[in-house]
């Protein structure tokens, strides 16, 4: 384990804890969007270094931006937005494959979609839980 990762964890966790305790909803949404972008960057970098796949990073970062926007829309549309993230991502992945004339492979699209589902959608529920009734307490069960 790298000392760089330990130090970033020791610095990062108190910052996230302070944002969750004292931040308003917009600050929390933006903070989790930044965390998702950093996580997706690490995820895609791991695949690029190993030459197994080249995830579509622009699509992953675009999905991360949706976390910052989830409380901009009315609450009754929230589940529709979350449910639309994956089908739109699939559509954009296949459009990328067609536009690049198969230079982007199905494996690249699959790795990208898995990263969006695993990282972005999971982290999207954190601000939603925090905004719920008694969410200030419930968020610590998830963390």
Task: Show where each model-derived region lies.
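Membrane-embedded alpha-helical bundles of polytopic integral membrane proteins
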Residues: 2-143
């Amino acid at each position: 384990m790298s000392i760089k990762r330990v130090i970033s964890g020791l610095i990062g966790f108190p910052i996230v804890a302070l944002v969750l305790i004292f931040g308003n909803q917009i600050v929390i949404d933006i903070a989790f969007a930044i965390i998702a972008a950093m996580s997706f960057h690490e995820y895609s970098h791991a695949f690029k270094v190993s030459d197994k796949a080249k995830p579509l990073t622009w699509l992953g970062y675009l999905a991360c931006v949706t976390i910052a926007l989830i409380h901009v829309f009315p609450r009754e549309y929230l589940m529709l937005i979350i449910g639309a993230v994956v089908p739109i991502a699939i559509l954009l992945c296949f459009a990328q494959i067609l536009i690049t004339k198969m230079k982007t492979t199905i494996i690249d699209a699959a790795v990208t979609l898995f990263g969006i589902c695993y990282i972005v959608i999971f982290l999207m529920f954190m601000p939603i839980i925090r905004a719920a009734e008694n969410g200030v307490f419930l968020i610590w069960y998830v963390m």
